[in-house]
Design a protein with these regions (language model features):
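A short, N-terminal amphipathic alpha-helix
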Residues: 49-70
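A structural signal for isolated positions on well-ordered beta-strands in alpha/beta enzyme cores
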Residues: 20, 68-69, 134
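Acidic donor-binding segment of Leloir-type glycosyltransferases
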Residues: 77-101
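Structural motif
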Residues: 23-27, 72-73, 136-139
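N-terminal nucleotide-binding beta1-loop-alpha1 segment
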Residues: 2, 6-43, 58, 65
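Short alpha-helix within the catalytic core of nucleotide-sugar-dependent glycosyltransferases
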Residues: 58, 77-78, 85, 143-151
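Short beta->alpha linker loops
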Residues: 48, 74-75
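Conserved beta-loop-beta/alpha segment of the NTase-like Rossmann-fold superfamily
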Residues: 97-152
Length: 152
């Protein structure tokens, strides 16, 4: 059953718009052990004020993508949660946005992920209702104009 707000604005369950995003942490091994012994790559600081995860989140927010699934490795994930919090800084804390977190368990030295990683991705893709999904990673430092990529 659709709520009055849903009927009024024409939104359906989780189908805010036709674009969604998967935001992931690094899968595999990177020789940055001195930097990542106690935190994932996504929460590494940059410029004294930012974290690496800020860059893909800002690209998504600037493109108006409001359905985001963040999937992260279980090890030391609390620093990512502490930094993202509600997602308010990127417009992901409103009633019309969706931000989900998935956690998978794998050894840092492994270059593969388990079945639970892909199961969570498939579930999100099926439920998102989006026509197109962009996948971004947190180990590349870049600002991308996704409006140009998707021709929004």
């Amino acid at each position: 059953m659709l709520s009055d707000t849903t009927r009024k604005w024409g939104y359906q369950k989780m189908k805010i718009d036709k674009y969604s995003a998967i935001l992931g942490n690094t899968v595999g091994f990177h020789d940055m052990s001195t930097l990542t012994n106690h935190r994932p790559v996504a929460s590494l600081p940059f410029g004294g004020k930012y974290r690496l995860i800020d860059f893909p989140l800002s690209s998504l927010a600037n493109a108006g993508i409001r359905s985001v699934f963040g999937i992260f490795q279980q090890d030391n994930i609390s620093s990512v949660f502490d930094h993202i919090r509600s997602g308010r800084e990127w417009g992901l804390s409103t009633l019309l946005s969706h931000y989900y977190l998935g956690i998978y368990n794998t050894r840092v030295e492994s270059s593969t992920v388990g079945e639970e990683y892909y199961d969570q991705l498939l579930t999100y893709l099926k439920r998102s209702g989006s026509n197109q999904t962009v996948a971004l990673n947190c180990d590349i430092l870049v600002n991308i104009d996704l409006n140009q990529v998707f021709h929004l």
